[in-house]
Amino acid sequence: MKENFEMVAKTFQGLEDVLAEELRGLGAENVEPGRRMVSFEGDLEMLYRANMCCRTALRILKPIHKFTAENTDELYERAKEFDWGSLMTPQSTFSIDTVAYSDEFTHSRFVTYRVKDAIADWFCDRFGEGQRPGVRLQDADVMINVHISGDRVTLSLDSSGESLHKRGYRVAQTEAPINEVLAAGIILKS
């Protein structure tokens, strides 16, 4: 029996219902549209299928740790509680992308630094000083997404790598190209 888990597909505002229908058509379960995203459940095969076949998704995320935090110190402590060794080793590289809609967390870059510090300190506490994964902005082994809404924090794995709109036919960008995800959404809505 395959084990289902929660996933989140990010999209543009206004395309949530179109993406939800696409996911249902691919066999996703418990599909729930939200604000610029659609949550759903499925197994590993569904994760791959969503990345390959969804025309109106920008990214497919897999939530790994949810918690509440009132400030950046609490964010650091709660992020440090996660077993980061289950995702990477001290030889791995990682990157963090942060989106914050909160009165308390107003600087997404500072949030990124605090989560990065929590991950680095988790490894240093277990493997010794200097034994931690490196940060790499491009082509990291593990891509982490931090989403904050109010005091609710979700840490997710980004299974897509680059934004899915870049998987199209273009070799190079032209002066004013239309995003492939947006174009697909417009066609599907018409």
Predicted feature descriptions by range:
Residues 2-142, 150, 159-161, 165-166:
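Accessory substrate-recognition/RNA-binding modules or partner subunits associated with SAM-dependent
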